Amino acid sequence: MAHKKGGGSTKNGRDSNPQYLGVKAFGGQEVSAGSIIVRQRGTAFKPGKLVGIGRDHTIFALQSGKVFFRSGRNNKKFVDIIPA
């Protein structure tokens, strides 16, 4: 006879890794070319002047300058870079 009970199984014990999404450079902040400005799922923020968008919808600076957030038509949010 076993002197300890067998270890049961559980349906818990998993957790996903953090995503680290959100705005990384705020309005008025100086950024260099290639800097990530926003990490997002989908296009909550859209690329404006001198800003690119990655495959995973990451918004990044194409040129060095100041970050500028603005609202376009239909309350769409755009991110621009104003060159220094």
Curated annotation (Swiss-Prot):
InterPro entries: Ribosomal_bL27 (IPR001684), Ribosomal_bL27_CS (IPR018261). One of its GO terms (molecular function) is structural constituent of ribosome. GO terms for cellular component: ribonucleoprotein complex; ribosome. Keywords: Ribonucleoprotein, Ribosomal protein. It comes from the Bacteria. Residues 1-21 are annotated as: Disordered. GO terms for biological process: translation. This is Large ribosomal subunit protein bL27.
